[in-house]
Design a protein with these regions (language model features):
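Short gly/ser/thr-rich secondary-structure transition/capping motifs
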Residues: 41-47, 104-107, 128, 256
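N-terminal helix-turn-helix DNA-binding module of bacterial transcription factors
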Residues: 1-59, 332
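Alpha-helical recognition/docking segments in bacterial nutrient-uptake
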Residues: 60-64, 68-173, 177, 235-236
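Residues at secondary-structure transition points
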Residues: 26, 30, 48, 52, ...
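Bacterial carbohydrate/catabolite-sensing allosteric modules
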Residues: 9, 41, 84-92, 139-147, ...
């Protein structure tokens, strides 16, 4: 059974069948449905190698997992965004290639090599860091890519994100509105844009309420429970506070553990607010108040943007800001 047999029975040219196999956006839905039905009836299922030869593509997209999540598969953000990416990639017949790294330099080179060697047709970056060197190189080379996050540089790129600064500001304003005046902040790795943005939201909320930032109440943490635990231990040595804003749920859960070990009643004596509203927050005691970020949707939209860029459809640049909201539970 060959592609010509499918074309003859479907009443189209072999090149049209090839484009249907590639899920080309310029082929009408009716034609795609008719060709796919004939393929199913004939038992014609082109493998990935055959599709690659037809399309001059790899039928794969890369997911670049930076050191933000390196060694941290326990963070629910990562599987949630991958699930969103996978759900749309599957519909396009695309495989995922996951790239990890031990350094920023290795991360950049691995990503570029994936594209240069045509092992992937485009990449999704799960984070950007300060003074990012990879994004300018990707943009200059014309490689298809999408960033989940915010980019500080001048290059015009495709991105999808939530308003981390504005969302953090709302979360801290919520605490200030409940009467807290000594609000501590557990920020993430300062090399990452997401950490800087959420810390900026903390600063803005304090300023709008006429409060100055006390450096003793700001600690940086790894994006992990242990990181939040250790950062809170340092906070407890630095001064008094009645609330903690943590830029990630795992950091917040670590903070709660450190407070509870000291006999502090979380939610009554000290309020704790997290960020991302991952599934773990609903199961700690008390349940965690957190900023809900549509993580799954971030992954879905990133693939939609990337496939549009690869296939030359849609608009460029495509930039979307998703809405987040505060989910109030027992911790604050």
């Amino acid at each position: 059974m060959t592609i010509k047999d499918v074309a003859r029975l479907a009443g189209v040219s072999p090149s049209t069948v090839s484009r249907v196999i590639a899920d080309h956006p310029r082929i009408s839905p009716n034609t795609k449905e008719r060709v796919r039905q004939i393929m199913a009836e004939l038992g014609y299922y082109p493998n990935a190698i055959a599709r690659s030869l037809v399309n001059q593509t790899s039928n794969s997209i890369g997911v670049i997992r930076s050191r933000l999540t390196q060694g941290n598969f326990a963070n629910p953000f990562f599987p949630a965004v991958i699930q969103g990416i996978s759900s749309v990639a599957y519909k396009h017949g695309l495989s995922l290639v996951l790239s990890t790294s031990n350094s920023f330099t290795h991360e950049d080179e691995e990503c570029l090599n994936l594209l240069r060697q045509r092992r992937v047709d485009g990449v999704i970056l799960l984070a950007s860091h300060r003074q990012d060197q990879l994004i300018p190189r990707l943009a200059e080379a014309g490689f298809p890519f999408v960033l989940i996050g915010r980019y500080e540089g001048s290059e015009v790129i495709n991105w999808v994100n939530n308003d981390n600064t504005g969302d953090a500001k709302k979360a801290v304003s919520y605490l200030l509105g409940k009467g807290h005046r000594r609000v501590a902040c557990l920020d993430g790795d300062p090399r990452y844009v997401v950490s800087a943005d959420r810390l900026a939201g903390y600063h803005q909320a304090l300023a709008e309420h006429g409060l100055e930032v006390d450096p003793a109440l700001v600690e940086h943490s790894e994006f992990s429970v242990d990181g939040g635990y250790r950062a809170t231990q340092r906070l407890l040595q630095n001064g008094e506070f009645s609330a903690i804003f943590a830029v990630d749920d795992l950091i917040a859960i670590g903070a709660m553990r450190a407070l509870q070990e000291r006999g502090v009643v979380v939610g009554e004596e000290v309020a704790v607010v997290g960020f991302n509203n991952t599934i773990l927050g609903a199961y700690v005691q008390p349940a965690l108040t957190s900023v809900h970020v549509p993580i799954y949707e971030l992954g879905q939209i990133a693939v939609q943007m990337l496939t549009a860029q690869i296939y030359g459809s849609g608009t460029f640049p495509d930039q979307q800001m998703l809405q987040a909201q505060l989910v109030v539970r027992g911790s604050a």
